[in-house]
């Protein structure tokens, strides 16, 4: 049986040439595939170097694996260093490793950001959980959870010129430079704006409640005095052009009487039941800075910017006595020690003491805080709080004088200061248009200071009281000492000596 042969034989010359061409094409294809494999191998090795892997050791002792690339004649440089040199190989390896390490580090940082942030968050959460056993963290958590002892800060857009607590309710009045009065209900958790009363066309310089809290009195740069009914929120009485000059201060004597003082040194006494002033006296030439009286309300005292303390007899409606002039502004005052002592603060930071009824010249002088004093309020019968341009509220013991420490702080000069009816809460406003509250109930536990007691004036002036937002450095070391003492007590035990 005849079988057809499909394979070509090399007997024919043309057929042999065709076979040789096919073999050449096959060999070329195999060489190209090997080159591609070697290129992929080199790329993988470069990626490993970029990721920080060490450079493979290509010393002459290493065995040939059949995948090493052959240098091209086109890249040959007769002036280049011998590639077989160990030194050049080490240098190349070091450069490649450092460059690859830096690049790979950056690449890992960029690529791992999302997952890295999650891992960091988880680590932080775990750290917080573990840190709850630490003394410092526990103290911080306790401070955060500790209930507030004073109302939060009140912030206004307008400059606050004066503040005043209501005698019976948890309400504070804030007078502003545009002539409005804001009434806030305060609480340790939050403050609530009750209403805003538009009372004056110019800056409201002083605001006071009557003793029974029924009426709100205000005086202004517009020379008027306004009386507002707290229940109806309506105007009760208007004393239009009460003074010929801008009114600077106002003082309530009782439920009916009040006094005012202006920028030109005029003092007037008013009765809410009448339309006109009871009397007026012009014994001074400069601004009346403050007016006050004692519980008997027989004498009305006035301090002025021209350095005089002037006393008026209310019943006789005339001046009682005027002090010797001082070369500084007398800015504020308070009555202490059972109405037996009058203390006056000055623009030079001094505190002058007068025996009651003897107002011609001071009987004692205390250098004070070495910073202008513009405000003073009695906290107890022997403790005063003073404030001024340095932004600090300081407590002072009266007769004998002692700096008790810093009650509170503002970032800017303090403009007004007041204490509530039970003497436990102080409010202060500053040039930053803010009102801050300070719980000073701890003053009830302060004992009386004797004249012969030793004290450190430098430390006292910088000491921070419990209401202050700053702590004392000594408190930190005191806590450390206490912890060390507790550790020593815990480590101590019965003796094992025979």
From Swiss-Prot:
Keywords: Repeat, WD repeat. WD repeats lie at residues 155-194, 199-238, 242-280, 283-322, 325-364, 409-448. Residues 12-23, 31-48, 83-95 have a biased composition (Acidic residues). The keyword Repeat applies. GO terms for biological process: defense response to Gram-negative bacterium. Residues 114-123 have a biased composition (Polar residues). Residues 1-133 are annotated as: Disordered. Disulfide bonds: none annotated. Pfam families: WDR55. Belongs to the WD repeat WDR55 family. This is WD repeat-containing protein 55 homolog. It comes from Drosophila erecta.
